[in-house]
Swiss-Prot record:
The gene is REG4. Glycans are attached at residue 50. One of its GO terms (cellular component) is extracellular region. This is Regenerating islet-derived protein 4. Induction: Up-regulated by mucosal injury from active Crohn's disease or ulcerative colitis. Up-regulated in colorectal tumors. Up-regulated in epithelial cells at regenerating margins of peptic ulcers in the stomach and duodenum. Pfam families: Lectin_C (PF00059). Residues 1-22 form the signal peptide.
Amino acid sequence: MASRSMRLLLLLSCLAKTGVLGDIIMRPSCAPGWFYHKSNCYGYFRKLRNWSDAELECQSYGNGAHLASILSLKEASTIAEYISGYQRSQPIWIGLHDPQKRQQWQWIDGAMYLYRSWSGKSMGGNKHCAEMSSNNNFLTWSSNECNKRQHFLCKYRP
């Protein structure tokens, strides 16, 4: 019995030193159907909503959820890989918008707008809401008319 307890203690000690235990114990859980990456939970919804309704639906999930801000290439790549497991052709609303309609883009969740991934046909006209474009496997963004109905991505920090 003492030997079994000692082995368990040794195993837990090894896991703690490698960081594996921290991932197992400290990792918060996301809502069912959402996925976890780097301290955030993401929900991909294949419902058709305009940008404003998509944002309202994200907020309805609580936990401070909004349409997703994408702040790095690593985050963009993880999201793109996840979405590609469901579909490869429909654009997806994200939380980037131009509320004053002056090409002054900002994230709806208040995150700093530093990382940019606009496609060549990114902005112009009456297009003041951003989408992840299915061209280039969801790694680039395009602007679109905010009243267009399409899939959307929500994000919150658990």
